[in-house]
C-alpha cells in the first residue's frame, strides 16, 4: 500500500463512518515500539492505522507475523518433497508466531461479527513461537517421511525467489536480514487472539491437512 492509498482510505472511513473497521498489517510489525522491526511512524501502514483510529470509528488491527503460506513457495516446498529438506532464511532456533491466511480470516470474521467491537491490536500466531525444526517435524508427520530443517542466508533465499518475484524479491531479502538480527518474531500473549478472542491458530499439521499438501 502506498501512502496516497492509505490517506484515501482514511478519508473514506472518516466520511462514511462505518460501524467498525478491521485493518490487517499483513505481517508488518506495528506493536513493538522501539524495536528495529517496528514500521516507521510515517510508513503507509502506520498512516492508515493512525488515521483510521483518529477518525473515531472503532478500529481493530490484526497483526500476524510470518505466513505459513510462505512455505508453499515452489523453492521451499519443492526441496521438502524431493530432498526431505525444509530450507528457510532463519536460524533453526528462531521462534516465530507463524499463522496461516485461514487463521487471519477467522480472526477478522470474529472481529467483524462480535456484538461488541474489539479495538486495538490483535496479534495472530502461534504461542510459544515455532522454530524451524518444529515446522520440519510437522511436515514429517504429515508426509510420512523424514524432513529436516536447514537455515539459509537471506541472500541465498533471494537468489531462489528472484526468478519468481523479480525486483520485488529485494525487500523480502531485507526483511529476513532484519529478522536475522533479532532473537525471534513473536506476538505478545496479552494482545493475542488467544487471549482477547479465545481463538487459537490451527496446528501446522491441521494446516497442511486443510490445504491438502502432499
Which functions belong to the PLM regions below?
Residues 11-20, 27-148, 159-160, 164:
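Oxidoreductase cofactor-interface core, primarily capturing Rossmann-like NAD(P)-dependent enzymes
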Residues 154-214:
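A hydrophobic C-terminal alpha-helical subdomain
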